[in-house]
Amino acid sequence: MKRVVLAAVLTAPVFTSCRSAPPQQSAPIVQPGSPGEITQVLTTEKAEAMQRPGVSPADVKFMQGMIGHHSQAVDMVELLKTRTADRGLHQLGERIEVSQRDEIKLMEAWLRDRGQEVPGPHAMHLQGAMLMPGMLSAEEMAQLAAAKAGEFDRLFLTGMIKHHGGALSMVQELFASPGAANDTDIYAFASDVEADQRMEINRMSGMLKERQK
């Protein structure tokens, strides 16, 4: 494996002056060539990519699958906007929508930066496609869309609790996969997903109990 090193920078003598010295340029990053090959000057982005830990198939599967998983949560919130007047649910839905959309953008960027396929947001909803853990089936989504008022509130909370539980299963599967989550970005992201989903499951479980009294 070729090493990436910083080339030494020779600086001219510095003379005292009333004028401030110009900003120093960062040292160029070079990659020594093999015998007979020339040395290459690398961009900062390429050098960082070469030093980045390897990406495993489990990493890619997790990010691709979680995009579809998050997209369904956004779809569920869209239904909530017109089917209930419960203010607490609307506030919950707003938080879920903002976080899920932001995380979808993050996952898409992660995949693009590593040259991986970025699936469409509803790739997991297609007929015959295998759903990620916790995702609602087409029949369950149709039942949720047809529900109103109190019935909708109950189905939304139970469905979203199930949905979040599936995300936890996906994180656990990732961490249990050999060679996975060595990339610092995906490790931090998956850890945040786990913490956030657990917190929201606890919140929604409390909301469901209050509405069943």
Where in this protein do the model-derived segments appear?
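Bacterial N-terminal signal peptides that target proteins for export
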Residues: M1-L6
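C-terminal motif of bacterial Sec signal peptides marking the signal peptidase cleavage site
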Residues: V14-S17
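All-alpha RGS (Regulator of G-protein Signaling) helical domain and cognate RGS-like helical scaffolds
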Residues: S20-K213
